[in-house]
Structure formats: structure tokens, C-alpha cells
Amino acid sequence: MTLPLLPRHDSDMPTAYQRTLRLRLMLLALGVCLWAGVIVVRLVQLQVLDRSKYEVQAARQSERTINLDPRRGPILDRNGRQLAVSVDVESIYAVPTDIDDPVRSARELATALQLDAAARRTLQAQLQRTRAFVWVRRKVDAATAQAVRDLQLEGVGFVTENRRYYPQRELASQVIGYVGLDNTGMSGIEYAFEDDIKGRAQKMVIRTDARRRPLGHIDKPSTDGHTVVLTLDESIQHVAERELERAVAETGSVAGVAIVMDPHTGEILALANHPTFNPNRFQAYPSARWRNRAVSDSFEPGSVFKIFTAAAALQEKVVDPDEVIDCGHGFVEVAGVRINDHDVFDQLRFREVMAKSSDVGVVRVAQRLGRENFNRYMRGFGFGSPTGVDLPGETGGLLRPTERWSALSLASLSFGQEIGVTALQLASAVAAVANGGALMRPTIVRRVEDRDGNVIRSTPPVSVRRVLEPATVTAVTALLEGVVEGGTGKLAAIPGYRVAGKTGTAQKIDASGRYSMIDHVASFVGYVPASRPAVVVLVSLDTPRGPRNQGGDVAAPLFARIAEPALRRLAVPSDDPTRVLRAAAPPAARVMPASYVPANAPAASDDDDGRMPDLRGRSAREAAITAARRGLVVELKGSGRVVDQRPEAGAAIEAGMSCRLDLARPGGQAPR
């Protein structure tokens, strides 16, 4: 068969066909390029621009991160005794996708964990979910963990966590504080030093397949928290709490506080509250027991405040210890208000005014001092402002500005009314008298260390300001010794030691807003030995009952029962050289408080000859203590060891002079 021949157009047909073909090829190539470009752009977007977003989505779909509590750093007393530690415990988890019979598993787990019916139903609902991980019970005791382990249930596992444990139970509980269920500090040192103690959380990453079946888990290690070393001495703290509990029980008091402090450094050796609580099970106690009354509760101090009225008057030379004061036959009228003494006194020397605690006599002296001078000294002693101690919840008390005083205020303030103070403020102010006149900032933390024992930071003694001259301190001490030797504080006496102190019985405000004739706060604060104080001790009992419930009756003997064991603990020599002091079983290695230097400690000089000792090369603490004992007001610059000092070694010095110590670490530069 012969096909017909198509007509040919030699001149134009090939050219048109080729053009069409070429155009089609170009369009096809362009389409391919555009398609490839879109793919490339999309790939760049997915793999480069949006990579992190899709990685997060993928991880979210295939991984679950479980945060485990970090190991909190320990809290230790000054001698390394453990007050708060973290112990390993087991937590129980389940992988629901690996459990074949969630109903049976829930029933058996509920029996082992002693769950009620409602909790068992909740657990069963959790096990029936299509999830890779659920908590069954966290931080169980060893017996419970073993009971669950004995069930040998598929899909049930264990992970090691840690729990806070307080080995000394109630000891210093208001100071140490406690942690909540999430292992976060809720009060005390646990709260105040949370950032140091908490550490970095451990993470458990669980990986799953497309059906959410676990493929295993990866543990990301935690970082332990830092160690916090307190100024407390466990032995002295134990004595303070034991004797305070006894006194509260014997007197029927509502509550009580006791503080033992080193007056030269401001370090708190004991801080006791009663009633107390066990932080291992803090939920079992009313929240009022968690409160640290020594820093958060203010009260009218009563006659113990006469210490500061007397100190200001003697410093300003408006009275002499042997000057006779007219005590008005037991009363004085101020601004139309009659102020009565607790007894009828007529003419008393000022030292007798203090020994017998005459309100009228103190009012007479305060009137000579004047309101502006009086206010200046009281604020100098720190009243009306927080002490700055590293404890949460501290209040500054109440001292109104003079423009808000009434015509009666100066008289009332002179014997401790119309003012609110905390127990720690009061102890710190008395420490300023005991140490020669310098107000020291009270400290509760000595240092913070890392897990290897390296010091992160420490707390050297800080002199806030000088309040009294040494001569005034000597005169005040003599007055306070008279209180114990022949006045209202006889029961505070300690055999073999000279004690200086003052009693107080402060009326409380009743529901009508008036001073109660029944309820009061009984207190005693003092220092011992009077000539070279090693400790300041404050005790306060809230609303003691019974026929003998004054400060001299109930607080003074409590002072003695706490101070005497503290002196033994610190091996402070007796004022009577014929007495042999029995040591209270000190630990093998301990750091002595500043108020006592053992015989083998480096001495500032062979004798205190009125010359500046050579303090170069010493630690900040050792140098500051040595200088403070010579009556110097110490100013520290820098950190580390002493590299320079002013006055220079060998220069003549006298009490009250300023002393600058420049500190530097090895390889560092001294401050300019």
C-alpha cells in the first residue's frame, strides 16, 4: 500500500515546527527547574531555616523529659556536725504501654502502697493511658519499695532520687527551716540560701517509637548543691533548747527564746525557740511553730532596756554611778501620768537604781539626757532597724521618730515601754556593751563551700559602728555586775565567774489595749565573764504563770543553766584560779569562737603592751578578732589574708582607735 505524499513547503514548515518544538522544550525545562527550585527551597526551609523547630517537634513526639530533684547541699554546724542532709530514696514509675493488665497491676500496687479505693481508681486510670511514663509514688521508704519490687510487675520501674533529712530532728529547726514537697526551701537557712543549696536538677529522658513504646532512657547527671556551714555549736544549741523547754514547762509559759552569741564577732552560737517542730514532718505541726520568734517577733523589753539608758547617760556624763537619785518615795508623775516603782524607794545611788531596777530612778536620769540624745543612742544600738542577719522574716522592731513621741514617751522608753525589739536586736545591743562598745552585725552563716570543700564565700566579723567608749563600758559593766551580785539578778550567778546582766519583766498589752496586770514577758540578758566576756546570753519567757514569775525568778536561773555549760564547752577559764574547769567533751577538731583563744593558737604579741600587733599573713577572721580584743574598730578591705595594716605593727594604740586591714588572696593585689 502506497501512502499519499503530503505536500511539502520547503521554505517555512521546518522552521515553524522547530520553533514549536524548541518552545515546548524550553517550557518543559523551565517547569522542571521551577519544580526543582521549589523542592530545593523547601528542603532548605525544612533542613536549615526551620530545623530547630522540627527537631523540637520530633523530640516532643519521641522523647519525654522527667525532672528529678537535685541533691541539696548539706547544712552543718561550726564543727561539721550534720544538721540537714540529702539521702537516697527510690521513686516508683510505670510505663503504661508495657502493662498488659492495668486493672490487676493497679490492684496489686494499691495493696503494696496501702492506697484507699479512690487513690486506686486514680492509679488505674493512669495505667490505662497510652503514655510512656507516669509516676506511681515518689520518694518511698525502703520497705515500700521492696514490697512493690516483690510484685515483679511488667512496666513498673524504679529511679533513685533524694529526700531532705534532718538527723537532729527538732534541733535548731526554726533556724534551719524545712523544704517543701518539691524539695525547695520554705523557711530558715533552707529558704535564705536556696540558690546555694539547691544544686542543678537531674533529668531522665525517655525515648519512644511511633507507637509510643519506650526505647529506653538517658540520665543527665545533676550538680550537687553547696555546703552551708553555720555559726551554731550543736552542743550549745542542744543545751539551750533543753533548758528552754524545761523552763517553759516549769513556768507554764506560752513560748520562749534563748540566744547565745560571741560578742566579739557577732557569731550566733545558739538560737533556740520553744515550742519547736520536727522538720522531717513539718506538716504535722501548726504553722506558728515554724516561725523564728527570735527575729520575727518584737516585744516591749521592759527593764532590760535600762542597760542602754544607763550606757547613754554615763557616756554623756549626765550621771555618775555613785550619784544619789531621788526616787520620789516610789513614784514620779510625768505629763499627768503616775509612774510607780515595784517597791518604795527614796534616795538611791545610781548603781542601786540599776541593781534594784527602779523605774523612777531611770526616768529621772533619762530626763537629763533628753529625747534627742536618747533617740540617737538607741538607734546607735540598732533599735528600730533589722540587724541584717542572714535569716528570713526579720523585723526591725518599733522605735518611732522623735516627732511622734508624746510628752510621756521619753520616760516610758527609758525603762523599755513604747518600743518593740526582737530578741536578736537585744542580744546584739548587749554584745556591743560586752565587747568594748562596737555594734557587731550578728551572723548565722560562717561560710559556703562547694562539694570539694573549697570556700565559695565566708562571713568575716563586721563592726557596724562604735556606740560606746571603753571607759563607759567599764562603768556599765560594774553596774550590771551589781544587779547579779546584790540586785534582782542574783539567780543568774555562776560559781567561779563574774556575771554582768539585767533582769526584765515587761507588761504585755491586753485585749483592751492597756498594760496587763497579769501577762508579761520575763527576761534576762547578760555576759560572762564580766571582765573578758566570752558569751552573751539572752533568755525570754512569754507569759510565765505562778506566784514567782518575774524576770529575776524565772529568766535569771535559766540564763545560768545555759551559760555555765556554754563556758565549759568553750573551755573559758574561771575567774577563780583555784577552780578547775571541766571540759564538756569537745570534738577532736573544732574552731574556737573569737572570745577564747587556746594556748596553742598564734598570739598577736607576747603581751598586750599597748602596741599594734603584726597581723600580716593572718586570715581575716583571726586578724579581726585579735584587733577587736585590743578595743580597735576594724575595717576590712578585700578578701583573703592580711597583706597590709594601719596602724603599722609596733605603733602605739589605744581602745577606740580605727584599724584598717587590707586583704588579698595569693597572686592577687591588695585593695587601694
Give residue ranges: language-model regions.
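Short, solvent-exposed alpha-helical surface patches in non-cytosolic proteins
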Residues: 172-174, 267, 307-308, 427-430, ...
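Beta-lactam-recognizing serine transpeptidase/beta-lactamase-like catalytic domain environment
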Residues: 2-12, 84, 207-219, 232, ...
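Ligand-recognition elements built from short beta-strands and adjacent flexible loops
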Residues: 496, 510, 539-553, 558-672
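Conserved beta-strand core positions
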Residues: 90, 256, 535, 632-634, ...
